[in-house]
Design a protein with these regions (language model features):
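Short catalytic helix/loop segments, enriched in acidic residues and glycine
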Residues: 1-13
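Alpha-helix C-terminal capping segments
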Residues: 11-21, 226-229
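Short, conserved phosphate/pyrophosphate- and ester-handling motifs at nucleotide-, phospho-/glycolipid
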Residues: 13, 153, 216
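Conserved N-terminal subdomain of the carbohydrate kinase-like
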Residues: 15-95, 100, 105-115, 264-266
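Short, charged, surface-exposed secondary-structure boundary motifs
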Residues: 55-60, 125-130, 209-213
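Structural detector of well-ordered beta-strand residues that form the stable sheet scaffold
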Residues: 116-119, 182
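Conserved phosphate/ATP/ADP-binding segment of small-molecule kinases
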Residues: 125-198
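Conserved post-catalytic alpha-helical subdomain immediately downstream of the catalytic base
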Residues: 204-265
Length: 266
């Protein structure tokens, strides 16, 4: 089935009122072109570059819904500066799936044209014989110095820092130059660190946990949708958390309304 940051983020954004503009830039093999057309039919503005393969993940979940094992059965080609030469945005959200999707030079080019938002997950994934292993971030200091907004979960924060306390990790990442550090903590909520202050965001209880895949991307969509409108850190975090709760309650990407999001926020 289709998935990944581009899929879950795009579907989440399209469910929200068009208060901000959004364009998806993706890179897929010919096998995924029908899915690109479905996104376009759904109203998503998509720029698609050709790749020899489409990245193909296999996810397996156990009894702990916050943990999964992964394999990568195919990899897409990295993005290039030439492909992104004319890209324009106030915020570029880099939803990397693997650690070679974006070179530091490509990130630097985009940073010269807008603010950089990064979901750290892909930068910490290395593929060896189809198996996915956590790895240290290549050129971490260089890329973090270009990053305005960084999102990571409770496992990724340990992979990137070797530490287990989210507040300590957030402060450390801010020292690299990251302006907004967003750490999601699964059923324990999330933590935002910005301008020297912490914001604790609750996790709203879902009626049922049906599908956790894509929750991180859904959170990013809600957070950036709110922040790009000038909404504050705490309110943006609560909006994003409510979207995650609604996403958990069904299979597939986020498909609810802004009214349902507002009713979920306590």
């Amino acid at each position: 089935m289709a998935g990944g940051t581009s899929f879950y983020f795009a579907h989440a954004i399209r469910q929200l009122p068009p208060a901000v503009s959004f364009r998806l830039i993706t890179k897929v093999g010919s096998d995924a072109l029908p899915e690109v057309e479905r996104l376009r039919t759904a109203g998503v503005d998509v720029t698609c570059y050709p790749s020899e393969h489409t990245v193909y993940f296999e996810n397996k979940y156990g009894t702990d819904a916050n943990r999964r094992t992964q394999r990568v059965l195919a990899k897409a080609d990295p993005f290039t500066i030439e492909e992104l030469q004319d890209a324009e945005a106030r915020i570029f959200h880099l939803g990397s799936l693997l650690n070679d999707d974006f070179s530091p030079e490509t990130v630097r080019h985009l940073a010269s044209r807008g603010r950089i938002s990064i979901d750290v997950q892909g930068f910490l994934r290395e593929v060896r014989r189809m198996e996915v292993y956590p790895t240290d971030w290549r050129n971490k200091e260089e890329v973090l110095g270009l990053t305005d907004i960084l999102k990571l979960n409770e496992h990724e924060m340990t992979d990137i820092s070797g530490l287990h306390d989210p507040r300590t990790v957030a402060r450390q990442l801010a020292e690299y130059g990251v302006r907004e550090v967003v750490i999601t903590l699964g059923s324990y909520g999330s933590l935002i660190y910005a301008e020297g202050r912490f914001y604790e965001i609750p996790a709203y209880k879902p009626t049922a946990i049906i599908d956790t895949t894509g929750c991180g991307d859904t959170y990013s969509a809600g957070y950036l949708y709110s922040r790009s409108q000038g909404i504050g850190y705490e309110a943006s975090g609560k909006f994003a958390a409510a979207m995650c709760t609604l996403k958990l309650e069904h299979n597939g990407p986020f498909d609810r309304t802004i009214e349902e999001i507002r009713r979920t926020i306590i």
